[in-house]
Amino acid sequence: MLKKENLTEEERSKYIGILDQKANRLKILIEDLFEVSKATSKAITLNIVDVDIVSLLRQVKLELQDKIDATDLIFRWQLPEEKIVLPLDSQRTYRVFENLIVNITKYAMPHSRAYITMENTENHVKITMKNISATELDLNPSEITERFVRGDASRNTEGSGLGLAIAKSFTELQGGRLEISTDADLFTVEITFLK
């Protein structure tokens, strides 16, 4: 299209913008595919340190606040006041939380609530994220964490289809468990880290 000589400057600028968007999406797809491939083959070196998981989740919330505010969703956060320190890779755990919260902003039903809770027990810490999906989910929950599988079959949202696969891989690499359950349009993710 850009090779056409009769394009106006406005049309040329529009097409360059589209190309730029496509190139950026391709770059993100390649980076995500590389990350999930490394994670599933266990070719990632983890930097395990003592991490206050409550503070980390609050940091993700703060850094994603603009994206959250851009939706018409109501987020309900129920996090402990006290520190909960676990041996984790803070960068990978941040990515897990980020992917899951961004997933909510993309796929939750407009004007609905999202619930994010953290439960601290003697043996484990469980983070639960629940939202009502914009569409009824007829996928097997174990399939949705596979590469390129998306709950939104219409693909009207941006994304690589790798976010949940990355979140699951990074959680499991750190000895945690990420489980997804669906009940019609209720989408629930539970992350469990043993103490």
Q: Across the structure, where does each feature detected by a protein language model lie?
A:
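Conserved glycine-rich
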Residues: G175-G176
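Short alpha-helical segment of the dimerization/phosphotransfer core of two-component systems
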Residues: Q21-L26
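A conserved beta-strand-to-alpha-helix junction within the catalytic ATP-binding
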Residues: N47-Q65
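Short helix-loop "hinge" at the ATP-lid/N-box region of the Bergerat-fold HATPase_c
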Residues: I104-T105
